[in-house]
Amino acid sequence: MRLKIGFILRSLLVVGSFLGLVVLWSSLSSRPDDQSPLSRMREDRDVNNPLPNRGGNGLAPGDDRFKPVVPWPHVEGVEVDLESIRRKNKAKNEQERHAGGDSQRDVMQRQYLTFKPQTFTYRDPVLRPGVLGNFEPKEPEPHGVVGGPGEKAKPLVLGPEYKQAVQASIKEFGFNMVASDMISLDRSVNDLRQEECKYWHYDENLLTSSVVIVFHNEGWSTLMRTVHSVIKRTPRKYLAEIVLIDDFSNKEHLKEKLDEYIKLWNGLVKVFRNERREGLIQARSIGAQKAKLGQVLIYLDAHCEVAVNWYAPLVAPISKDRTICTVPIIDVISGNTYEIIPQGGGDEDGYARGAWDWSMLWKRVPLTSREKRLRKTKTEPYRSPAMAGGLFAIEKDFFFELGLYDPGLQIWGGENFEISYKIWQCGGKLLFVPCSRVGHIYRLEGWQGNPPPLYVGSSPTLKNYVRVVEVWWDEYKDYFYASRPESKALPYGDISELKKFREDHNCKSFKWFMEEIAYDITAHYPLPPRNVEWGEIRGLETAYCIDSMGKTNGGFVELGPCHRMGGNQLFRINEANQLMQYDQCLTKGPDGSKVMITHCNLNEFKEWQYFKSLHRFTHITSGKCLDRSEVLHQVFISTCDSSKMTQKWEMNNIHSV
């Protein structure tokens, strides 16, 4: 009996010692609660971006977050050496991992974007019908000048005595600056939002913003009204700064006068001047570098007016997810009267998605039922494949991680598509925001324009398009070249770094983008058929070519001296028997004779055949031939006559330079 009691006591001592050592080891081991900030950040990242098949314990091979800091103890009386087994199993696991190549976690980690994780906490907006939103003004917006011209965005119509001055201002600036100068810089505007927008409540923990405005030889009042509207309608706690980038202007009112004027805001508004004309695209990248204070970059054109409560709806999605880029609904400010109206088109609520045709012309298409189903209310943000490019908001660090704009893009054109594709294909989102509205003035006919500087060379916009499709469109680029055949041999510079960016960030294919995001583009703009011939259409053995003269949507084409520069004299005839220029088709006019040019899709105006050996264009539906009058410079169809030289044509390829 004494032996049994002794045995029991010794056994209890051994077991007690073992349990004590286990408790001691546990207290010395690394625990989740004791992680360093770096380890906690890594765990947060893994929670937000879970990886599949980590194994039974949920840990990846090589993950040392729960690695013991002391070896397993050897307990007297327990014959199993736990530490040796642990070392043996670890070596076996390491051997199996290396023998089998990279673990699934290693592979998956390489597929993750290298963008910073979300560190900002923000609650979703809440819709409370009937309860005025917390960012809504409590009182009606005050007028800039009570009873003044243009208040509440009502049209200002000038009399005939101003005609000459108005025309001169339109030629110089693109707008009726005579009327603009009569309107208060602080004028009140109309509210074009859906009524529901007034009842959204936003977490006040919004990110702050730097508003970046690029200008070149802008009119004074349109530029300053842009600045005034931002200051007037943006809560001061969120407006970190307004950064003006002067892209080498030579107007006197944009020099010392501007420097003195912005002192009114005690440093809130800053101006930086480029030492040469950089163009809108690169000037915006410069603006991102000059902006130091805001967490978000908001880009506005130099002739805008932000509307009531524009800020919170625009920045809230970015505050929730830093990889979201937002775009306000863009309203139209008349360049003549300064009335503000909604854009035409879109769905029954006026909402549209950004799109393009295959020649890369900007388009707007109605919001789809698929996108509507993703929202609970019609005033929530919705996905868009592309943006127009002039007005958008993006988290500053995210924009830098994307590489800003392609540094090879020059002056203007294509940058809106480049940033849109980059965002979507590399893991971000592009949202249009119905409750954030900004008015924008569009240039009027008669503006002399701002020609690019000499160092840029010819065809900068077309070169931009080529760079974009070569980097982002993959096999779809063939459809661009079918629509813009003159660009096929256009030199577009080095894109190796851009290709490397796509590879390093594991950006998705354009096919994925077309199927998942831009799925409705081909319904509106079907993939173009191959071209049979393309180039100038020259009268055989003459110096005259068919010229659209810039006319569209029903204008008559004419004969003009051949200039070999493409543009209005560049046509293509495709396998669908369409004779086209960009998104316009040639067809017979209402009189059944003269040839006009009008917008078409791929199911319309399939009515031409080109017989190269006969130098003849035949109008299929009428059986007549393409003819011309070199005296009247008219182009028409007439009864085919093989002896008539005016019915003989040749198509000569033209390459842009």
Swiss-Prot record:
It catalyses: L-seryl-[protein] + UDP-N-acetyl-alpha-D-galactosamine = a 3-O-[N-acetyl-alpha-D-galactosaminyl]-L-seryl-[protein] + UDP + H(+); L-threonyl-[protein] + UDP-N-acetyl-alpha-D-galactosamine = a 3-O-[N-acetyl-alpha-D-galactosaminyl]-L-threonyl-[protein] + UDP + H(+). GO terms for cellular component: Golgi membrane. Residues 30-657 are lumenal. InterPro entries: GalNAc-T (IPR045885), Glyco_trans_2-like (IPR001173), Nucleotide-diphossugar_trans (IPR029044), Ricin_B-like_lectins (IPR035992), Ricin_B_lectin (IPR000772). It is a single-pass type II membrane protein. Pathway: Protein modification; protein glycosylation. Its main location: Golgi. It is found in: Golgi apparatus membrane. GO terms for molecular function: carbohydrate binding; metal ion binding; polypeptide N-acetylgalactosaminyltransferase activity. Residues 206-317 are annotated as: Catalytic subdomain A. Its EC number is 2.4.1.41. Mn(2+) binds at residues 301, 303, 440. Substrate binds at residues 247, 277, 412, 443. Residues 532-652 form the Ricin B-type lectin domain. One of its GO terms (biological process) is protein O-linked glycosylation. This is N-acetylgalactosaminyltransferase 7.
